């Protein structure tokens, strides 16, 4: 590693991927300089240090992005070897419980950037192969073990290395061969829970997890009230799909991390369209057997599937609270007949 070698300055350009999202905008100048360095054949490895507010997935995508005219294709001479995230052991838990947005701390000047601190931290931890747990000299041994267990639960596959001043043996972060895009996308602890790869609870600090699965819909008002007023503070991370009775066709994705809770549209359920329309979608055709094996005569493929990761979780109490948010049997009967009167105050587009 030679400190005197730096990227030359170029006119900065942006390459926007097809969906036009901010987080999928790639820097063309980075691509050009990486190609120059590779063709110079002077270096074996390139270490790219992103800003603290950058998301890891677009960085990885840069190395698999190919322009339509074929002029940009980094995969011809480079690949991602390791994704490393540095965690500030002293501030992580405080930041993780913060409801603040990046703009609240003047960390972004991108118009329309509505990312929260905790969601960014979660993305960076869940996508990493190696996590440097830095500033370990500034926390107690007990807090360090607790933090280690939390991070391990968020990303069970990552190597967690305690450091001070981010000093680490280069062999831990270079030429590891650890990165695989598909594996990285499914390395998060909540995904492993959904796929029935249960991670054992850490007994000392009670970092545990469970999956809540139901077919019946949530009552829109009762579930919203649960989220706004009684959502357990000891839940560190939760994510999954759900549906509410007032929107039978719409699938919703739920996500919480620390002090941030959000819900977004996730498309429609297959049962909301006739079979003749479903078979026009590759996602349905390729997964038809699995989808139909889980089909319900009452609700089709609609389901609630939420993963909860937290500390000292009272699974039975949380399950009871969630069950109380579901339509009861009388309400289900009225709902099927179109007699159930529902109001919908969810701040999510329908």
Annotate each PLM feature.
Residues 29, 33-36, 58-62, 127, ...:
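Alpha-helical scaffold elements adjacent to nucleotide-binding pockets in ATP/GTP-utilizing enzyme cores
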Residues 57, 221, 316:
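Alpha-helical elements of the RecA-like P-loop NTPase motor core of helicases
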Residues 311-315:
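Helix N-cap motif at beta-to-alpha junctions
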Residues 226-229, 318-326:
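Short amphipathic alpha-helices in soluble, non-transmembrane regions
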Residues 1-119:
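Nucleotide-state-sensitive switch-loop elements of NTP-binding domains
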Residues 92, 98-304, 329-350:
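C-terminal accessory "lid"/substrate-recognition subdomains
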Residues 303-307, 323:
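C-terminal structured domain segments
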Residues 30, 49, 83, 128, ...:
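Residue-level signature of catalytic and energy-coupling elements of molecular machines
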């Amino acid at each position: 590693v030679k400190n005197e070698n730096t990227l030359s300055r170029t006119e900065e350009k942006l390459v926007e991927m097809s969906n036009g999202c901010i987080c999928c905008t790639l820097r063309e100048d980075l691509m050009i300089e990486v190609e120059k360095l590779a063709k110079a054949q002077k270096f074996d490895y390139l270490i790219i240090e992103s800003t603290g507010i950058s998301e890891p997935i677009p960085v990885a995508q840069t190395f698999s992005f190919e322009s339509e005219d074929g002029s940009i294709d980094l995969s011809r001479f480079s690949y991602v070897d390791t994704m490393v995230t540095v965690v500030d052991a002293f501030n992580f838990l405080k930041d993780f419980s913060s409801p603040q947005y990046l703009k609240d701390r003047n960390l972004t000047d991108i118009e329309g950037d509505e990312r929260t601190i905790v969601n960014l931290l979660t993305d960076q931890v869940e996508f990493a192969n190696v996590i440097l747990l830095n500033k370990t000299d500034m926390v107690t041994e007990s807090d360090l073990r607790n933090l280690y267990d939390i991070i391990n639960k968020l990303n069970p596959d990552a190597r967690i290395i305690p450091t001070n001043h981010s000093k680490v043996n280069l062999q831990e972060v270079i030429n590891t061969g650890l990165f695989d895009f598909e594996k990285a996308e499914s390395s998060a602890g909540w995904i492993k829970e959904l796929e029935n790869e249960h991670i054992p609870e850490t007994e000392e600090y009670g970092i545990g997890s469970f999956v809540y699965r139901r077919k019946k819909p949530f009552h829109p008002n009762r579930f919203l009230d649960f989220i706004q007023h009684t959502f357990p503070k000891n839940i560190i991370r939760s994510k999954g799909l759900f549906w509410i009775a007032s929107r039978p066709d719409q699938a919703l994705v739920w996500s919480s991390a620390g002090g941030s809770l959000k819900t977004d549209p996730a498309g429609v359920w297959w049962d909301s369209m006739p079979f003749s329309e479903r078979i026009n979608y590759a996602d349905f055709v390729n997964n038809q057997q699995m989808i139909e094996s889980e089909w319900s005569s009452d609700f089709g493929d609609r389901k609630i599937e939420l993963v909860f990761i937290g500390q000292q979780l009272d699974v039975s109490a949380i399950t009871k609270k969630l069950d109380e948010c579901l339509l009861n049997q009388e309400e289900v009967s009225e709902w099927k007949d179109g007699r159930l009167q529902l109001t919908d105050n969810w701040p999510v587009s329908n």
